[in-house]
């Protein structure tokens, strides 16, 4: 029962099975172990930096998106104001009155957009459960009722056997 000259010649009389185990208690680390650990740490720090950069990109994207939506809202308001101005000019209304009406419309639309944005803010709205969520909840309740019926059957069956 020896392996490469290591171990017992014969297991007879030794009260052992002769199984040979590797001694890893005094194992010497491979050359370059420290460098590989150092490389792992640098790799982890690079990944953390990449995660921060991607988070920054997402935040920048959100900011740009909000700026674009705000610009789009302002553009729609100005288009409506220009339509009113063209219509009033065709009717032959005085320029001072045109300017006053257009300014009034612009203020009205800005206030309306501001009120809509307040209504859309996530702090004031509470999420409502969707139809799918309600359906899932009902399905789970029905499934639980069916399981209760199975257990009841098992109880009745067990009572009859005794």
UniProtKB/Swiss-Prot annotation:
Residues 48-150 form a coiled coil. Residues 11-26, 120-129 have a biased composition (Polar residues). Residues 70-111 form the CWF21 domain. SMART domains: cwf21. Involved in pre-mRNA splicing. May function at or prior to the first catalytic step of splicing at the catalytic center of the spliceosome. May do so by stabilizing the catalytic center or the position of the RNA substrate. Associates with the NTC complex (or PRP19-associated complex). The NTC complex associates with the spliceosome after the release of the U1 and U4 snRNAs and forms the CWC spliceosome subcomplex reminiscent of a late-stage spliceosome. This is Pre-mRNA-splicing factor CWC21. It comes from Candida albicans (strain SC5314 / ATCC MYA-2876). The lineage of its organism: Eukaryota, Fungi, Dikarya, Ascomycota, Saccharomycotina. The gene is CWC21.
């Amino acid at each position: 029962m020896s392996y490469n000259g290591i171990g017992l010649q014969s297991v007879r009389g030794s009260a052992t099975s002769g199984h040979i185990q590797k001694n890893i208690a005094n194992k010497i680390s491979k050359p370059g172990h420290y460098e590989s650990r150092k490389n792992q740490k640098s790799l982890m720090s690079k990944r953390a930096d990449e995660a921060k950069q991607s988070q920054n990109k997402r935040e920048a994207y959100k900011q740009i998106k909000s700026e674009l939506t705000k610009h789009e809202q302002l553009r729609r308001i100005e288009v409506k104001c220009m339509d009113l101005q063209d219509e009033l000019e065709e009717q032959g209304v005085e320029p001072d009155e045109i300017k006053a009406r257009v300014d009034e419309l612009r203020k009205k639309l800005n206030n309306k957009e501001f009120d809509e944005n307040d209504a859309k803010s996530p702090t004031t709205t509470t999420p409502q459960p969707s139809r799918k969520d309600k359906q899932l909840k009902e399905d789970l309740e029905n499934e639980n009722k069916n399981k209760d019926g199975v257990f009841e059957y098992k109880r009745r069956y067990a009572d009859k056997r005794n």
